[in-house]
Amino acid sequence: MFAGAPAQAEDKIQNKINVVATFSILGDLVSNVGGDRIEVVALVGPNSDTHVFSPTPADAKKLAAAKVIFVNSLGLEGWMTRLVSASGTRAMTFVVSTGIKPRKMEDEHHPGHQVTDPHAWQSIANAKIYVANIRDGLSKADPPGKSVYEANAKAYLAKLEALEQEVKAAIGKIPADHRRIITTHDAFGYFGGAYGMAFISPEGVSTDAEPSAKDVAKIIAQIRKQKIPAVFMENITDPRLMQQIAKETGAKIGGTLYSDALSDATGPAATYIDMMRSNVRELTKALAP
């Protein structure tokens, strides 16, 4: 009986649908909708930066074995087209950001040229759109599981609705003139737009280029002029730049914000819901009276 157990377990896993999500936050959303019917792999893991990710042959194998792939798009995964081509995958691919209103901004390095902010998940309203797209994608790829995906999505959307009210109430306790902070890269524009906060960053929407001395000097002048109370680290970036800016301006160093990746399982942001709660907790701790 014992000898047969591993084979049974293996059969059970083989019957699951192999799904690839491009990064850890998306992997968690997919996992909540797919539940026990799917096996999810995130290409870019916890505390890792999707902007500068370099795929390996092992990642191509993951795509080749997948039945379904979920991508964020909006310019986040610049490496994905080459990886899909190299893998020869026949998986169905779904763009989870379909239907959101993209945030456009001036490209500081190319004046007159706009870039799209890919970090749409930082607004819970957008995360709900992601969940609906994941539900529909899984239902299309696996019609027998449609009712399961619909039930899972409905339950998870209710949790996101409660989370959104929680976030709005917490940010509402921060005085309006304190709702301005500095983060390493411009990952929180959707959060700021949704919940009434201003995030200023020495780096643009991607972390793939170091800010120039001129960019940093501009930020330092802005902090002094606007009396911005706090600067925050991100889990995916080198903290030294923020430490330098804080030292030169006297701004308080807030906690670590989770922007493009979850924490590992032992950290405070191991799921999307935990990530949003952790970020709000750090913001209110540093900014609320």
Q: Model regions: which residues?
A:
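C-terminal segment of classical bacterial N-terminal signal peptides
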Residues: M1-Q8
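Extracytoplasmic metal-acquisition and chelation regions
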Residues: A9-P289
